[in-house]
Amino acid sequence: MLFPLMSQIITLSKPRIVKSKNEGVMHACGHDGHTSILLTAARILNEVKDDFAGSVILCFERGEESGKGYKYLLAYLDSKNINIDACYAIHVSPDYKSGVMAIGAGGINAGSLAFDITIKGNSGHGSRPYEANNPLDCFVDIYSGLKSLRMNNFSPFDPMTYSIGAVQMGNKYNQIPDKLRFRGSMRFFDREKVGYKFYEDFKSLIINKSKANNCKVIFDTYTKPRFPIINDLNLSALALTSMTDELGEDFVKEASPSMGSDTFATYSYQWPSLYIMLGINNEEKGSGAALHSPKFDLDEKALIHGTAATARFVVDFLNSDIELADRPYKNRLRDFFIEEDRSDEEIEDIYETITR
C-alpha cells in the first residue's frame, strides 16, 4: 500500500502581534506546525519501517492559501505513475482543546468559489453627481440582492455561507470614480445542488443589476465551484480506533463540519482520504485565537499528540485490510483539471513546469 501524508507550506502577511523569535514571521495558520508534525512522524515511521508493509510518501504543498501549489504536486504524482491507496492530512484548530484529535466522516470541509468583479460607471465631480453614474449605486443594489439570495433561492437545510471581503473605489473626497471593484467567496457542501446554483444565480444577479444601473461589469475572477473535503468512512472509523488506543478517549473527539476550505479537497477526489483537526486551544498559554487572526498562536505541545497519532494511524492503516471506496477522479487527473475549468494549454503548462 502507498500512503501520502500531507503538509502545507505558506507564509501569510499579518500584523505580527504574536511574534516568533525569528523576526517578521508568525504561525498565522499553523502550517509550520503541520510541517513539524509531518517531518517528525516521518522520522518515527522510518525507525519502525520493518513493522509495517507498504510505502509512505511525504507531500509538502506550497501556497495552499493561494490555491496555486496543489496542481503541481498532483501532476508530479500522476507523471510518476504512482499508485496511491489513500491520503491523510492534519490541520490545527482553535475549536478544540489542546492535543485533541477531532475526526469526522463524510463532508468535513466546505467547497468554495471566489469572485473578483469590477463595475464600470461614469466618473464625475462630487458637486454634480447627476452628471455621473456612480458605480457604488450599482454595487449597493448587487449587495442588497446578494443578502437576500440565501433566503429566496436556497433551502435552509443546505449549508452555505458567502461574504465580501474587499471593496475598493476612488480616493478623493470630491470625485466620483468610474469604477468599483469587489471581491469575496462562497462556501458549500453540495457542489451540484448549492455550489453551481449560486454560481449561476449570483452571476445573473450581477449582470441584471448592472444593466439596470447602466453600468458595465467585468468578471476578473469567477471560479467554478471548487470541491469540498470528503472523508472516507472506513478511514475515519480506523482513525477513531487507532488514535483512541494511542492517546486515550479524552483526546479523541468527533469533528464538526467546517465551512472553511482547503486544497486537500483536490486529493480527496483522487483517492480515499482523511482530513482531521488537531486542537491547540490552551487558555493558560494564550492559544485559541481564530485562524488568520493577528493573535493566532498554537500550543506547541499539541504537536506531540498530532505526531504520535499520525504515526500510529499510518502503521495501523498499512497493516490493515481495510476496504476503501474509489473516488470520482482516480487516475483521471486531466479530467479533474478540465472540471476545474482549466484549458488544455494550462494543463500542458502544469506538466511542463514539473519537468523543468
Predicted regions and their residues:
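Generic recognition of short, well-ordered alpha-helical segments
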Residues: 40, 68-72, 130, 197-200, ...
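Metal-dependent amide/peptide-bond hydrolase catalytic core
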Residues: 140-356
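DPxDG-like acidic metal-binding loop motif
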Residues: 35-42
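Loop/helix-junction capping segments adjacent to catalytic residues or to phosphate/diphosphate-binding pockets
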Residues: 35, 67-68, 229, 304
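Histidine/acidic-residue-rich, glycine-tolerant segments that coordinate divalent metal ions
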Residues: 6-26, 32-33, 45-177, 262, ...
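Structural motif
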Residues: 1-2, 55-57, 84-88, 250-251, ...
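Non-cysteine beta-strand/loop elements that form the S-adenosyl-L-methionine
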Residues: 2-5, 115-117, 275-281
